[in-house]
């Protein structure tokens, strides 16, 4: 009984190590694709984009009412970017935006976004997207130290107008913010 228990543990650990090796082998390939997509979006943009922040919403279940009553949820600001659609119909974008944060202080953000895009209707202009953004932001309450961000993206669009959004996870009274903006392609 003891021997079979140790054999089972050995095989479990061995399989995990093989899996980790495959993940790291694929990580190089993934990082190469990531860099190539950023470079192609920078060097060969199809569109230039105007970003207009629309709403921030602090999840009420994750905040004291006194805090949410004081927070800014109208993120005035704007941004500019460039983007392209790849051969699979997925969206790639490089952007820079500045907006008023929860404390009504300016917050810049710049980065790369990618969304897998679906066109579920007969009208090809309507599109839905799910993906991520990776970039850098800086906040007043962190003395504008550059902070890396990796966040989910989702969107609903028609033609050149897209309502794009993310969710910033967090803890109680911190993070847990829905942030959305309009993106217009030219």
Curated annotation (Swiss-Prot):
**Sorted alphabetically, which keywords does the UniProt record give?**
Acyltransferase, Cell outer membrane, Membrane, Signal, Transferase
Looking up Pfam families in the UniProt record yields: PagP
Site Role in the phospholipid gating: which residues? 172
Catalytic activity as recorded in UniProt: lipid A (E. coli) + a 1-hexadecanoyl-2-acyl-sn-glycero-3-phosphocholine = hepta-acyl lipid A (E. coli) + a 2-acyl-sn-glycero-3-phosphocholine; lipid IIA + a 1-hexadecanoyl-2-acyl-sn-glycero-3-phosphocholine = lipid IIB + a 2-acyl-sn-glycero-3-phosphocholine; lipid IVA (E. coli) + a 1-hexadecanoyl-2-acyl-sn-glycero-3-phosphocholine = lipid IVB (E. coli) + a 2-acyl-sn-glycero-3-phosphocholine
SUPFAM superfamilies according to UniProt: OMPA-like
**Could you tell me where this protein is found in the cell?**
Cell outer membrane
The family assignment reads:
Belongs to the lipid A palmitoyltransferase family.
Q: In terms of one coarse class, where is the protein primarily found? A: membrane
**What is the recorded name of this protein?**
Lipid A palmitoyltransferase PagP
- This protein's species is Escherichia coli O6:K15:H31 (strain 536 / UPEC)
Q: Which InterPro entries match?
A: LipidA_acyl_PagP, OMP/PagP_b-brl
- List, from the UniProt record, the residues annotated as the active site of this protein: 58, 101-102
Q: What is the lineage of its organism?
A: Bacteria, Pseudomonadati, Pseudomonadota, Gammaproteobacteria, Enterobacterales
Give the record's GO CC terms: cell outer membrane
Check the UniProt entry and state the signal peptide residues, or none. Answer: 1-25
Quote the gene name from the UniProt entry: pagP
A GO molecular-function annotation? O-palmitoyltransferase activity
Annotated site residues (Role in lipopolysaccharide recognition) in this chain:
67
Stated EC number for the protein is: 2.3.1.251
Subunit structure, as described in the record: Homodimer.
């Amino acid at each position: 009984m003891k021997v079979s228990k140790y054999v089972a543990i050995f095989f479990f650990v061995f399989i995990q190590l093989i899996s980790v090796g495959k993940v790291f082998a694929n990580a190089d390939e993934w990082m190469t694709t990531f860099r190539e997509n950023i470079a192609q979006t920078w060097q060969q943009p199809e569109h230039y984009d105007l970003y207009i922040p629309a709403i921030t919403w602090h999840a009420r279940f994750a905040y004291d009412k006194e805090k949410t009553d004081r927070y800014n949820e109208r993120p005035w600001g704007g941004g500019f970017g460039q983007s392209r659609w790849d051969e699979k119909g997925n969206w790639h974008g490089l952007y820079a935006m500045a907006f008023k944060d929860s404390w009504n202080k300016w917050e810049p953000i710049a980065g790369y976004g990618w969304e897998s895009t679906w066109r579920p209707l007969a009208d090809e202009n309507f599109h839905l997207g799910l993906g991520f953004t990776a970039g850098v932001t800086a906040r007043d309450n962190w003395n504008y130290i550059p902070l890396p961000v990796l966040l989910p993206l989702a969107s609903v669009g028609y033609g050149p107008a897209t309502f794009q959004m993310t969710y910033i996870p967090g803890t109680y009274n911190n993070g847990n913010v829905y942030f959305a903006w309009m993106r217009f392609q030219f």
